């Protein structure tokens, strides 16, 4: 039984909770407005998703359209002090709101139970800092989702995504003896890069998360054509990031793991 998957490391928003990853995107828009009266769109707020939140704000400031707006208002580009100010506005807003987005995505609870029945451990990590995770984790547990371990983006001196460190910290905490027997699951490109950099199998989620960018209710009423277009857009970004597999949501993960286990049993290696 050595040649099989022993652990999955799951992202949070858009992967296990918060269908469409709306908690952080809305708060970025509000933080820019509150700190500097600068408008950004939800679509712009989604572009760097998966990074740590300070790095996310930094990346937003470098988007050509956002930089142009900033230059028009302040006659200069965004500085580190500006990023600090937006982050300072972001944090209390996110801490206050994250519990409203803590319900598990459809299929998550059953999938976790199925994985655990196979002896697979459940790790997790997030682009959220610890202060946010300390609110989100117990709220999600109240809804029935409780991974075996979690790591926040500001926990490790080495940093967060797209580096491998949060994923590897899960490997250490869970006592997994081979990174190639782990699967990193994420709905955004930096999380796929994280898994690849850690030497893991990677699975992208094309519908439940940031790249698809729809609420659960909107998804339920969406035409098949619209779903197909959005799915293809999201899948192409995740495959471009290097994902080994792309599926709709975490509910599809057990089938993927069965496929990976078959490949491992035949001697295939990453």
UniProtKB/Swiss-Prot annotation:
Domain of life: Bacteria
Active site: 11 (nucleophile), 53 (schiff-base intermediate with substrate)
Keywords: Hydrolase, Magnesium, Metal-binding, Schiff base
Residues that hold Mg(2+) according to the record: 11, 13, 187
One of the record's GO cellular component terms: cytosol
MF-aspect GO terms: magnesium ion binding; phosphoglycolate phosphatase activity; phosphonoacetaldehyde hydrolase activity
Binding note for cofactor: Binds 1 Mg(2+) ion per subunit.
Record field: catalytic activity: phosphonoacetaldehyde + H2O = acetaldehyde + phosphate + H(+)
GO biological process: DNA repair; organic phosphonate catabolic process
Record InterPro entries: HAD-like_hydrolase_sf (IPR050155), HAD-like_sf (IPR036412), HAD-SF_hydro_IA (IPR006439), HAD_sf (IPR023214), PGP-like_dom2 (IPR023198), Phosphonoacetald_hydro (IPR006323)
Keyword DNA-binding in record: no
Matching Pfam families: Hydrolase (PF00702)
Entry cofactors: Mg(2+)
Top EC category: hydrolase
Listed EC numbers: 3.11.1.1
Subunit structure: Homodimer.
HAMAP family in UniProt: PhnX
UniProt family annotation: Belongs to the HAD-like hydrolase superfamily. PhnX family.
Annotated function: Involved in phosphonate degradation.
Name of the molecule in the record: Phosphonoacetaldehyde hydrolase
Organism this protein belongs to: Salmonella choleraesuis (strain SC-B67)
Upper classification of the organism: Bacteria, Pseudomonadati, Pseudomonadota, Gammaproteobacteria, Enterobacterales
